[in-house]
Amino acid sequence: MVLPCRSVGAPGTALGEMVFTTGMNGYQEAVTDPSYLGQVLTFSAPMIGNYGTGDQALESDRVWPAAVIATRIGDAPGVAGPVGFRSWLAAQGVVAVEDADTRRLVRHLRDHGAMRGGVSTELGVEELLALVREHPHLDGRDLSVEAAGGRRRLGDAGPTIVAVDCGMKQGILAGLAGAGMRVEVVPAGTTADEILALGPDGVFISNGPGDPAACVPVIDALSGVLGKVPVFGICLGHQLLSHALGLRTEKLPFGHRGANHPVQRAEDGVVEITVQNHGYAVVADSLPDGVQVTRTSLFDGSVEGIAAPELLAASVQYHPEARPGPHDAAYLFRAFRDRVVA
């Protein structure tokens, strides 16, 4: 598929896995989410960038998608701040295009699955296609170390949580601290012995990009802390915990990315509307002893939460911090704190 479009960002050529989000807002939060490393992000909404940009919407200190595609990218200031989104993307050096037939592109990805693609302001079609065909797939790639930040602390009271940063959003860090926990952030690749040497009351595993099965160092670290302190994971962290517990993951046809995904809790049947951003899912065709599925997607029946009560471990596939989005699952940060201090 070849789509004509108009450049409104930085010039250049960008390659990656083509994905789409159905979120109507939160465009600045989306492009600063490290989970989009290695991907070209398409917004399905007819217009983005219609309320400006501001530092309060940043989930990290940089833009992570290789390129941004939209039908229309606004450039007016707004309630978020005085700088328009189009100008902000250009200043960040991001390849961004508009006037693309995003409806056609999204339907193609929906019908044929995630695939490699590229955006270029400088190459011809055949040159770009040749580069796309040579570009590596995300499968088998551990991107957690590249997406992780440095060591840092947040919060000065409450139980101490060691958060393993695989590409953690600022909103998740704020959610942990806001629930009354002192958070010590360490990068992906930190060993179990190094984590336990910090004397944590609990361990958290963050979201992030790449193939969870390839994140062997984090999986090994989790295996070394399970049963010693309470463990909680979100998104990629949910998938990595699942691997440490003996489950496996598989690639979804086109992923879950949006702010209106219904998830049902097994314990009481309550449905939560959730924010999601993932391209892999946990496979629960053979549950190890002591592991249970706690939440399920009402869109496709995929696993959205697991727990191993005897090992003090639990995780969810979706984002309870929801920046922006519904806060149906915000209680999960407090629930983790309650488990830690119990």
Located regions from the model:
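A glycine-centered loop/beta-turn motif at secondary-structure junctions
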Residues: 305-341
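Phosphate-coordination loops involved in phosphoryl transfer and adenosine-cofactor binding
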Residues: 157-160, 228, 290
